[in-house]
């Protein structure tokens, strides 16, 4: 029978069918090989957009720098980065005029944060450029290495544990004539294996001291390492993203704290909120524009797209914004906040791994590291790569490219949103002084513009004025990729608005399925995803029921735990059948032990163990959840865990799910092969941190643990805490006198050891 596919949509409103056109099923594309080419593209493009600016040379590093600020006003529609300082400052002034006290209050909030933030804030985040080893590392390790090097160079302000004091060290480190660092290297040697008598290669890890002069250190401190952005759907070309080092991160964090605080107070800002809260906020702006456009006015909405947002933004402009926003604040605060944009004006982009060459005979492969691109003969490269290298050569220093203009992806999302909103804010009638007026929504580089006017000419004039105003601050609305509609239908940050936001369900598709953490977590995450989508994304009861059945099927195939009475043969079926036969109450078996599925859409909020507890045989209960059973993982004490789920766009989201510790919540062991590589030292460091932090948490259960604002080390804090707790326990009779004396003695010993050290 032939089915005409359009028949499927007869009963579906057009806006609900939008989901079906999204490229969100299946695996997203990943990048392979080196990101060097993409990074060179970014650097070259950024310079092209600002090419009419002024060239200068950085006196400290010798890097050539291009400054497009207050450059020529554009005469065509090509994207450009020539922001005008006075225009940006005026936009800020108007923003403050229409939101009295907004900057003042945000500064006060930020000042409090600056004084209280601990340096461990920087351990959050994934890969970070580690300047000591000149490559990426997990954030915690990169921070540890930085602090270790600082201490060995006599910079010790960071020992207070406050982020602001760590940043003092960073500032001082930049004035030092030289910095001594410890680098890791590998030695390979051939030795004869005693057992097999064969020759084997033995690797040993060495650490060696190395001195960096001021120039080399500054280049590293200002370096952003680059990688290729993975898993981007709906694009043919990959693009580069940057990861900054520890020197820059802390300063950026404070700037973004200030900008976040401002964004929270701006009704047009799509950041920092998300999800349903964001939808409600945005729907308000639309409602305002629609109710104000009485019968006499037309209202149109542009679904906006900006050309190369990051590459046309300029850190110097951000410096001007910060200078204005903080103008009545204490000097120290203004200084702390202006350092991030200054560092970004002098940033260097690391070109990544370099290029891989293969000989025609495919017998030889060789890596050309980025450092060699400045001097290598270009005859080995194809045309497009040759052009890239020729263009970037004047900018190269030690394998990094000087990149003064532009912002790199995702660094100042909040602050750039403030800039965008300040232009939307200029659309009020009292500022446009004509019949048209505008408002809109801004979230990083994404925007929606709502224009109201008495007639079509007015709408056109309003759009033109908005377009030109944006050009003055380095924002380039793309005329090709933006489109206009009667207000009531538009798209913003992948939310589709059609007289209210429509659920774009396809975006959630990638997060359905089995996560692959362990049997316990996967079951919990799977049902939580379905539950959340019923709440937030119009997942109807029938579809949810079907999703649940598909999930259980998927789960059983993943963990080979088909029901005990099934005919399917897997390598687990023998054990599971045996368990099935000797279990009296078969309904009590977990799905992962071959039991039946008791979930339906009404009880998705209950962890499976709790759902089946009353139905379980006693000895099964005893095995499953017995803390004395060595297979029961009790790593997590809280009852709520966090899983990382991948929505189709945007960063991975953290999602809470209920965690019940059972024999099924195992933690896979680390791959052993890492222990033979140069990463081994890092791993040991990481485990040491883990142990220290776990110990610290034992002393300060989260309920009583307020972040210390004073200055004391972790050890001192734990010792004083132990003394207080011991005294309370002794006085209330929970511990004996001897135990109390022993605890006090241990505490004194620890303090004595610290003094000797």
Swiss-Prot record:
One of its GO terms (cellular component) is host cell nucleus. A motif (Nuclear localization signal) lies at residues 187-195, 203-216. Residues 249-256 are annotated as: Promoter-binding site. Residues 55-64 have a biased composition (Polar residues). It is found in: Host nucleus; Host cytoplasm. InterPro entries: RNA-dir_pol_NSvirus (IPR007099), RNA_pol_PB1_influenza (IPR001407). One of its GO terms (molecular function) is RNA-directed RNA polymerase activity. Pfam families: Flu_PB1 (PF00602). Residues 286-483 form the RdRp catalytic domain. It catalyses: RNA(n) + a ribonucleoside 5'-triphosphate = RNA(n+1) + diphosphate. One of its GO terms (biological process) is symbiont-mediated suppression of host gene expression. Its EC number is 2.7.7.48. It is an enzyme of class 2 (transferase). Phosphorylated by host PRKCA. Its main location: host cell. Residues 50-82 are annotated as: Disordered. The keyword Nucleotide-binding applies. The keyword Phosphoprotein applies. Influenza RNA polymerase is composed of three subunits: PB1, PB2 and PA. Interacts (via N-terminus) with PA (via C-terminus). Interacts (via C-terminus) with PB2 (via N-terminus); this interaction is essential for transcription initiation. RNA-dependent RNA polymerase which is responsible for replication and transcription of virus RNA segments. The transcription of viral mRNAs occurs by a unique mechanism called cap-snatching. 5' methylated caps of cellular mRNAs are cleaved after 10-13 nucleotides by PA. In turn, these short capped RNAs are used as primers by PB1 for transcription of viral mRNAs. During virus replication, PB1 initiates RNA synthesis and copy vRNA into complementary RNA (cRNA) which in turn serves as a template for the production of more vRNAs. Belongs to the influenza viruses polymerase PB1 family. This is RNA-directed RNA polymerase catalytic subunit. It comes from Influenza A virus (strain A/Turkey/Ontario/7732/1966 H5N9). The gene is PB1.
